[in-house]
């Protein structure tokens, strides 16, 4: 099982959501410590080691460091726009 980091990022995002949606996202995030690269994950172009998984209408962006067996959740955001990618770019630049 991988270590899971960045849960405070997830919890902050979940506060404003409906409980059912928040639970779906939380379940998806927690599953990453068991399977850091699930079949539905996609590696982000231009960001080595960064991946995304979708949970309903939301994107979960995380970094997987296999040498440390660490999953770090970086961002969670809506899928209907590219704001989450812009936030990632600002965060890493």
Segment roles from a protein language model:
Residues 27-53:
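A short, surface-exposed loop/turn module that caps and links secondary-structure elements
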Residues 1-28:
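Arg/Lys-rich, positively charged N-terminal/basic patches that mediate binding to nucleic acids
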Residues 12, 31, 81:
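Active-site micro-motifs of SAM-dependent methyltransferase domains
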């Amino acid at each position: 099982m991988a270590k899971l980091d960045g849960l405070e990022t997830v919890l902050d995002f979940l506060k404003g959501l409906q409980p059912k949606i928040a639970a779906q996202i939380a379940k998806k995030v927690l599953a990453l410590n068991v399977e850091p690269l699930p079949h539905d994950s996609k590696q982000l172009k231009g960001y080595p080691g960064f991946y995304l998984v979708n949970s309903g209408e939301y994107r979960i962006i995380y970094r997987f460091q296999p040498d440390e067996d660490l999953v770090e959740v970086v961002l969670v955001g809506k899928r209907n726009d590219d704001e989450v990618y812009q936030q990632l770019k600002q965060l890493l630049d």
